[in-house]
A protein has these predicted regions:
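Enzymes that bind and transform nitrogen-containing heteroaromatic metabolites
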Residues: 1-178
Length: 178
């Protein structure tokens, strides 16, 4: 395992593989919530040093009433944005360069989020672990979790957990040949 690799993805999807409605809507995520259960998200967030978001995901979360990543370094990948909010920084360049820079800055545990971004990092061989929370709903259409990836990624299931809401959480480790 290369030490400079961003390590984790934590994402929710519908049973049919969508992470958002066609318009980017996330209201359906509420189907997975019961009571105060956070499905390990707080523990996950406490274990990361920084987040890398794609432009689309950034634009969705920027519309939230409260910035959800307080206290974490947030890097937005985009070739089209000119600026981002003060709590984030903009990056346009090679993913391997970003991973190496973060490692040398002491950032070792990174959450990569957003369908296109996750796909690009998988294609680059820069993801070690994926946690997928499957929400018990079929959307029928929307934004898929994975885009075309020109690299096969062998995954090893490390744990599963089901919840009363119908949510099923799958944790995978990505096998790397390096």
């Amino acid at each position: 395992m290369r030490e400079e690799r961003p390590t984790k993805d934590y994402i929710a999807m519908s049973i049919d593989g969508y992470i958002a409605r066609k318009d980017g809507g996330l209201d359906w995520l509420e189907y997975g919530h019961t009571g105060d259960e956070d499905y390990g998200f707080k523990k996950f967030m406490n274990g990361i040093d920084a987040l890398i978001l794609g432009r689309n995901t950034y634009e969705v979360v920027s519309g939230f009433d409260k910035w959800p990543y307080g206290g974490k370094r947030v890097i937005i990948l985009s070739y089209t944005l000119n600026k981002v909010r003060k709590e984030a920084e903009l990056f346009c360049g090679q993913l391997h360069d970003l991973a190496s820079t973060l490692f040398h800055e002491g950032i070792k545990h990174v959450w990569v989020d957003g369908g296109i971004t996750v796909s690009k990092f998988l294609e680059a061989g820069l993801v070690d672990d994926i946690t997928i929370s499957i929400i018990a709903v079929v959307l029928g259409s929307g934004i898929p979790l994975f885009r075309t990836i020109n690299r096969e990624n062998q995954c090893r299931l490390t744990s599963t957990q089901s919840y009363p809401s119908g949510l099923v959480q799958l944790k995978y480790q990505i096998a790397h040949d390096d």
